[in-house]
Regions:
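Glycine-rich loop(s) and the adjacent beta-strand/alpha-helix scaffold that form part
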Residues: 14, 29, 60-142, 300, ...
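Rossmann-like flavin
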Residues: 1, 228-249
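Short, well-ordered coil/turn residues at beta-beta hairpins
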Residues: 56, 74-75, 80-82, 165, ...
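Short Gly/Pro-enriched turn/cap motifs at secondary-structure boundaries
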Residues: 9-11, 69, 106, 149-154, ...
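A glycine-rich dinucleotide-binding beta-alpha-beta segment and adjacent secondary-structure elements
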Residues: 242-324
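Glycine-rich phosphate/pyrophosphate-binding beta-alpha loops
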Residues: 134-139, 178-181, 285-289, 320-335
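An anion/pyrophosphate-binding glycine-rich loop and adjacent beta-alpha core
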Residues: 116-238
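Conserved redox-cofactor binding core of oxidoreductases
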Residues: 1-69, 89-90, 139-140, 254-275
Length: 339
């Protein structure tokens, strides 16, 4: 989300698993052991730098202190790739009070703050931990990342439109994630739900990119299909007359290839939203990514909070690091950050 020009490619399966599976294959080929159920309890830092970690092996999430405690000495260094803390409600609420327990997260349950706190305690420089991104395309009728975001973004945001329950567009559907998430939260604060709408033409690219997913959305009641906009509006509690007027105005923008109201980029393949059936899914921002984190030098060495100098033997990459994406990460570009 948020791209103004094409700048990335994706895996055939459309997710990061297509990358991780290849990395695992390479680790097995090189004989690199993968330690599962291993909880890093402490980073061992001395006057000479970082020398290893203390862990609990056989850890049972989320039971703190479970498993067998042992120390692991590093031969050359420790690389921190512990990710973000989007699933840690207390810690993320400290950073940004509005991201409380009422918001779900796209992350797995282990995306917590223990190592964020540990690196802070051993003197690692961190910055902008309150820069936390929500994915605006989430669906409230499923837990976690789910699949509903695929229709909301790939079909409706790119080839349809987003409206509120009053029947009005309220944001540029292709704006960055912060702009869109904030706009949805404002609508919700004023008692209005937000919806992603596409027609028969709008879902065709989605069906091509992700075969079979449209039916899965329908089977799970994440989206609904209607023969007319009137039926859609009545079923979803949207002002029907205003919705039809909004769609008519939007179709004019499509034909003119210009959105003078919200400044949305009109895709050259975009067709007017007028061909039945019409599809709709509800929108709900979910906590997705943390842009702040450890500050590193150009060799990925973590800096000391007192000296701003690299800490010997300590490196970091991925979502654990900061000063990479600014206040709003663009979709997919964290792949290079991790690699």
């Amino acid at each position: 989300g948020g791209h103004s020009v094409p700048r990335y490619v994706t895996t055939k399966i459309g997710s990061g698993a297509g990358i991780v599976s290849k990395q695992l294959d390479k680790c097995h080929e090189l004989g690199i052991p993968i330690r599962l159920r291993t909880y890093v309890d402490r980073i061992i830092r001395t006057a000479d730098g970082v020398e290893g970690v203390e862990v609990f092996e056989g850890y049972r999430f989320p039971k703190a202190g479970s498993g067998r405690h042992r120390s692991l000495k590093a031969n050359k260094g420790v690389i921190l790739c512990y990710g973000g803390f989007s699933a840690d409600v207390p810690y993320r609420t400290i950073q940004d009070p509005k991201l409380n327990a009422t918001l779900d997260t796209t992350n797995q349950p282990g995306a917590t703050s223990e190592l964020w706190r540990e690196t802070s305690s051993i003197g690692c420089l961190q910055a902008q931990n309150d820069w936390i991104q929500c994915g605006p395309w989430g669906n409230p009728h499923e837990k976690g990342m789910g699949i509903g975001w695929q229709f909301n973004q790939t079909a409706a945001a790119e080839y349809g439109l987003w409206t509120n329950s009053a029947g009005n567009r309220f944001v540029n559907e292709l704006a960055n994630r912060k702009v869109r998430s904030d706009a949805i939260m404002v609508e919700q604060a004023n008692g209005r739900k937000c919806f992603a709408i596409a027609d028969a033409n709008g879902v065709k690219p989605f069906e091509t990119q992700r075969p079979g997913m449209l039916n899965k959305h329908l089977e799970r009641n994440l989206i609904f299909k209607y023969d007319t906009l009137d039926e859609l509006a009545k079923a979803q509690g949207i002002d029907a007359e205003q919705l039809k007027q909004t769609v008519e105005e939007f179709n004019g923008y499509v034909k003119n290839k210009k959105d003078p109201v919200l400044g949305r980029y009109i895709n050259n393949e975009q067709l007017p939203v007028e061909t039945a059936p019409f599809y709709v899914g509800e929108l709900q921002p979910k906590v997705h990514h943390t842009m702040g984190g450890l500050i590193t030098d150009d060799k990925c060495m973590v800096l000391d909070v007192k000296t701003d100098k690299p800490i010997k033997g300590l490196y970091a990459a991925g979502e654990a690091t900061g000063h990479v994406h600014g206040a709003v990460r663009l979709g997919s570009v964290a792949i290079l950050d991790c690699l």
